[in-house]
From Swiss-Prot:
Compartment list: Synapse; Cell membrane
InterPro entries, A to Z: TMEM240
Keyword Transmembrane attached: yes
Residue positions where Phosphoserine is found in the record: S169
Transmembrane recorded as keyword: yes
A single Gene Ontology CC term: synaptic membrane
Gene from which this protein is expressed: Tmem240
Protein name in the entry: Transmembrane protein 240
Record's bilayer topology term: Multi-pass membrane protein
Chain ranges passing through the membrane: 5-25, 90-110
Coiled coil (UniProt feature): none
Pfam families listed in its UniProt record: TMEM240
Source domain of life: Eukaryota
Major location (coarse): other
Amino acid sequence: MSMSANTMIFMILGASIVMAIACLMDMNALLDRFHNYILPHLRGEDRVCHCNCGRHHIHYVIPYDGDQSVVDASENYFVTDNVTKQEIDLMLGLLLGFCISWFLVWMDGVLHCAVRAWRAGRRYDGSWTWLPKLCSLRELGRRPHRPFEEPTGNMVHVKQKLYHNGHPSPRHL
């Protein structure tokens, strides 16, 4: 599956929106809410797993207080055996960025469908012919090669300088 230019642009746009949210808002408050509210509901009280897979079985998770328990920093407490709070914050931020990116890609598709449906009703109006070319990144670099016509109906021939291989020179169009 090849990614189109629109997909890449919207993924970068989504990542920049996440960075803007992180810079403008207190991202630590959002992540602390995740750690203090959502994770305890998933783990349950006293680190009891309340998963639906074994509803009648209660699995107690006993934390291992080994060498890693010496770390006392609130920014670096250990959530599981190998994953720290900072790593979960990183994964949550990346997940949030991808969700926003894919939402923007979906909105781009919805916009294109809406524009196509709207233009289908206005087929004979030529005032919106620039919109699909603006939305299509492939067409931005290409120039339309239409023959120029004079008002009398005679064709005007435009001479272009060509490269040695026959392609038109972009400097002399």
